[in-house]
A protein has these predicted regions:
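A short beta-loop-beta micro-motif enriched in histidine and acidic residues
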Residues: 39, 51-64
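Short histidine-centered beta-strand/loop micro-motifs
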Residues: 53-59, 76, 101-103
Length: 132
């Protein structure tokens, strides 16, 4: 059984007689959207196994993540700059190498990623080893 605080609540917001409720998860000004007339858009879901890591990589455009389940940490050269749990929305810095980690021993980390990248760039640049 996954603890309730590690799962994003998706329903149960509307009250009797109410037909719609928008649960706003992220509403901020963001200055790093590509300025090109067109941008590449990628939307995906990802899973990091309990105790698992992503590869070392950097994002080449604006990237937003919606944590659906579990816990997430992102290790950068400066340390852990991103920490999230189910229900959080976060962005990772553009062009800063890092790797993601699921520190929970039993619960997979699940998220939805949204990427906006200039058309002449790949969404992600991967590194085989820690780049610093």
């Amino acid at each position: 059984m996954i603890p309730e605080e590690l799962t994003l609540r998706l329903s149960g917001y509307t009250k009797p007689g109410q037909e719609l409720f928008r649960n706003v998860l992220f509403d901020q000004l963001y200055a790093s959207i590509p300025k090109d007339p067109q941008v590449k858009v990628q939307i995906y879901n990802a899973e990091i196994a309990p105790g698992g890591h992503t590869n070392w990589h950097c994002h080449n455009g604006a990237t937003f993540f919606l944590a659906l389940q579990g816990i997430f940490e992102a290790e950068f050269q400066e340390g852990m700059l991103v920490r999230a749990k189910a229900g959080d929305v976060y962005s990772e810095p553009i062009a800063k190498f890092h790797r993601g980690h699921n520190p929970h021993p039993d619960v997979p980390y699940l998220c939805i990623g949204f990427c906006l990248t200039s058309p002449d760039r790949e969404h992600v640049t991967n590194a085989v080893t820690r780049p610093w």
